[in-house]
């Protein structure tokens, strides 16, 4: 679809479900993203926030939806939408989603969803898209794909003044994002696409959010893609609670080995964000801190049972940082460094998950954090 065609479709949707709609609101939109709200009755929270990522290959590939909620019923709705490949159209997906949410909260079907079956009005919001020949259309689409980022930069900001998705990101990190985009396009052209569109788009969003984050910019942690893979990250925890024994250990480690961080490996599967990343400690060897054999982490957050597709990767990183300190993690100086490896970490992780699935997870008293 051409940029002007996608823009017309988004404006059409926003004209139906504006920011004052009684049931479903499109709060803001860009060519690659929708920010929406669904209004639900008490006792549920009054506003349910949903996000939709629109891929460059839309409508050949389906938009990706996720929700800011831990409710498994909501996750189930989005998983069913993801599993349904019958229609990639934003309009039809939006209709299905609104109807399912109304059904979930025992609300009557809203009449406005029927408007989504209508064809796009000619010249919607001043947009005219006359195609005089197939050749012209193909030429336009090729230019749109090549220069998509430039069109996005020129796109009118929504009413709420939302800034460019690259706002607040340093030049060196923008270069990394651009390198990934080019690599993905080349892989697509070569028919050698790795991962899934859903996971790749979400991981790109997570990476952009991290690059904008103050925690990242102030050096609490850093992120590096392994072999430029969007699905394999090295995360360095560079700052922990200065009053913790772990902080003191890291100072000693710096003097002895020149290492002043905890290195984590995050690996993501094709079905991310519906499944959690697999996270393990690479170095140094730690005791305590809920670190298992091989470097795996004993955290319900990192299991299917405790995971939510709404969780951001930065929140996971910060939670791991806090959990290591809370669990009184200590550096094991002189330990065999080869004891931490992927195979052993996966084995430890699978064993602990089976135990907790059978016996449940321990929830510490509130005074313990």
From Swiss-Prot:
Pathway note: Protein modification; protein ubiquitination
Keywords: ATP-binding, Cytoplasm, Nucleotide-binding, Transferase, Ubl conjugation, Ubl conjugation pathway
Gene Ontology CC terms: cytoplasm
Induction (free text): Up-regulated in pregnant endometrium during implantation.
Annotated compartments: Cytoplasm
GO molecular function, one term: ATP binding
Name listed for the protein in its UniProt record: Ubiquitin-conjugating enzyme E2 Q2
């Amino acid at each position: 679809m051409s940029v002007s065609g996608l823009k017309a479709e988004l404006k059409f949707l926003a004209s139906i479900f504006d920011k004052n709609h009684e049931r479903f609101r499109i709060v803001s939109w860009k060519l690659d993203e929708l920010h929406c709200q669904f209004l639900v009755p008490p006792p549920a929270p009054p506003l349910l926030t949903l996000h939709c990522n629109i891929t460059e290959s839309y409508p050949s590939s389906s938009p990706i939806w996720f929700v800011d909620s831990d409710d498994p019923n909501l996750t189930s709705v989005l998983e069913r939408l993801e599993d349904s490949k019958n229609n990639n159209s934003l309009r039809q997906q939006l209709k299905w989603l609104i109807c399912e949410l109304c059904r979930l909260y025992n609300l009557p079907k809203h009449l406005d969803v029927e408007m989504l079956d209508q064809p796009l009005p000619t010249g919607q919001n001043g947009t005219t898209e006359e195609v005089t020949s197939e050749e012209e259309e193909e030429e336009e689409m090729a230019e749109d794909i090549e220069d998509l980022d430039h069109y996005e930069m020129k796109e009118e900001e929504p009413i709420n003044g939302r800034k460019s998705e690259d706002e607040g990101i340093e030049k060196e990190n923008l270069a990394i994002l651009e390198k990934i985009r080019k690599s993905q396009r080349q892989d697509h052209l070569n028919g050698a696409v790795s991962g899934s569109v859903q996971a790749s788009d979400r991981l790109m969003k997570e990476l952009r959010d991290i690059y904008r984050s103050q925690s990242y910019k102030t050096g609490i942690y850093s992120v590096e893609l392994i072999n430029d893979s969007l699905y394999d990250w090295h995360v360095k925890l560079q700052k922990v609670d200065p009053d913790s024994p772990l902080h003191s250990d890291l100072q000693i480690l710096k003097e002895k080995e020149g290492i002043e961080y905890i290195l984590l490996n995050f690996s993501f599967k094709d079905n991310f964000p519906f499944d959690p990343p697999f996270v393990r400690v690479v170095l140094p060897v730690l005791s305590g801190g809920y670190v298992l054999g091989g470097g795996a982490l004993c955290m319900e957050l990192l299991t299917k049972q405790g995971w939510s597709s709404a969780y951001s990767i930065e929140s996971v990183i910060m939670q791991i940082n806090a959990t290591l300190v809370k669990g009184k993690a200590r550096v094991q100086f002189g330990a065999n460094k080869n004891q931490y490896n992927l195979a052993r970490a996966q084995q430890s992780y699978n064993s602990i998950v089976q135990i907790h699935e059978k016996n449940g997870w321990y929830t510490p008293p509130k005074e313990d954090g």
